[in-house]
Amino acid sequence: MKSTSILFSGLLLAAASPLACSSSDSAGDVDAGPPISLGDGGFVDAPEQDGNKPQVDGGFPGPDGSVLRADRFATKVVSFTPGDCAGFGLTAMPGVVLGPPVGGGDSNGSLDVVSLGFEGEIVLSVEPNAIVDGPGVDLLVFENAFLTSGIPNAELGEVSVSDDGTTWKTFPCTPGPGPTYGSCAGWHPVYSAPGNGISPVDPAKAGGDSFDLKDVGLARARFVRIRDRGTVACPASPGMKPTTVGFDLDAIAVVNAQTP
């Protein structure tokens, strides 16, 4: 199936206007009908979320009454190219992937996500901030993975980073049988959620998948690209197609930020 590229140029975190797409194709080309869940995130027939997250003083509530800058997370969806069987969360874009994660812990994945679809792709910006190569983990990517008998229910994604949005450095992601998946995103549960006291920028507690810019030889990055690397394709019958196939993006968080 030919994918539709949806551009979200200029859709910033603070924007209160309805979602607008600037593309020769419209969002209507993507099947965003009633969501059909096949157990995604640990739920069946999962309801879509509105993507709204509590904000305070131009940022987001942090643990212990602190305020986290809005640009410690994605501030803009630069582009979104849904793959086949995408659609879940599309009506809540872009807000559903901006700001902090809404983790569900070991047993249940977040429903505050957008499904990329089979081989779908999304590009995010953290501008005006930037991810910098500092001590240890620099970037966290949050999917809605959960554990079944201690084994990750993984929907994998390949993560790339860029400082200019043109030249990319990619963390190698080679899907395999598991139960661990190397530098792929999408296999660690997420524990941080608004109001639960777990900092979304603490890699020791937040959950999600960790990335170090040093591993790809980059000193700074302002853009993050995620591509679905799942191995489950869509059903052939149009009437049986779910809208939850592929990597389900909850959020990204900047651990080592140019402006903390």
Locate the predicted segments by residue.
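A domain-level signal for the mature, folded cores of soluble proteins
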Residues: 51-157, 170-260
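Residue-level signal for well-ordered, solvent-exposed loop/turn and beta-edge residues enriched
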Residues: 166-167
